Amino acid sequence: MRFLVFGASGMAGHMIALYLKEQGHSVVGFSRKKVSFLDKQVNGDAQDKTLIRETIEEGNFDVVINAIGILNTFAEKSPEAAAYLNGEFPHMLARLVLVEDMPTRVFHMSTDCVFAGNTGPYTEKSIPDGQSVYDRTKAAGELRDGKSITFRNSIVGPDINPNGVGLLNWFMAQTGPIGGYTHAMWTGLTTLELAKAMESAAHEQASGLVNMVPEGNISKYELLGLFNKELRNNSVEIYKDDSVDLDKTLVRTNFDLPFRPSSYPKQIADLACWIQDHKQLYPHYTLG
């Protein structure tokens, strides 16, 4: 199959693009920065609507994957950019393939942060109530048309950027001791598991919004413990921190897609194997 991945140099995008390539698919990456692992790349900016339209119209893609977004702190500092990239951009992609009557579908990434975390758990029918610029712009960007798929979940994964702000990147730079929130509950996927979910979905005809998460949740303390076990040989001291009480647990009720995510321990174990096999991409990580 032919895939176009927007944000191919980012935390999620690089994993998705490289995984799909290694599965034998034709993958074109779209990003501002060149990446070493893709032969086919378009270097451009998400603001360049002409380049985006031409790339999609000429590419004959089966799926366009949107892994572009402005994260929390940056969204607060640049609300207009967040409104466009998080909220408007995914709808622009969806409209483009609909108006041009292309067979191409759009896969979009959303987040548990569309919810405030005060009244969890949340299903696909729950009304987003997040209050920050990031929360609201990500909620605005969710696609619910009859052709696109929105994958809603939190994500963790490696970053080829040593200055990336993701949880795993942060953890890999720690020597300890560090605190892990025991009352902050998490549901999500590794970026590797998300890539697998997207590859599976590309072969299906379903559409709409899916809380793509395993059954059940874990605390951030438990999640850090899995990182510690699989990536640092339990070398980092992690203490329990009960100062944060937050439950953004997602519950999946839409099973139109057959893919079922692996358990959290297996996801992190699989991710550790991936990082070890691709350690040239992550020289800033010291593996235990």
Go through each PLM region and give its residues:
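Mid/C-terminal beta-alpha module of Rossmann-like enzyme folds, strongest
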Residues: 195-247, 280-288
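NAD(P)H-binding glycine-rich loop region in Rossmannoid oxidoreductase-like domains
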Residues: 44-87
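Glycine-rich NAD(P)-binding loop of the Rossmann-fold in SDR/ketoreductase-type enzymes
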Residues: 77, 81-92, 125-128, 132, ...
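NAD(P)-dependent short-chain dehydrogenase/reductase
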Residues: 120, 131, 143-188, 192-193
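N-terminal Rossmann NAD(P)H-binding glycine-rich loop of SDR-like oxidoreductase domains
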Residues: 1-23
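Adenosine-cofactor binding site in Rossmann-like domains, unifying the SAM/SAH pocket
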Residues: 29-52
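Amphipathic terminal alpha-helices
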Residues: 263-288
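Conserved Rossmann-fold NAD(P)-dependent oxidoreductase catalytic core, especially the SDR/UDP-sugar
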Residues: 91-129
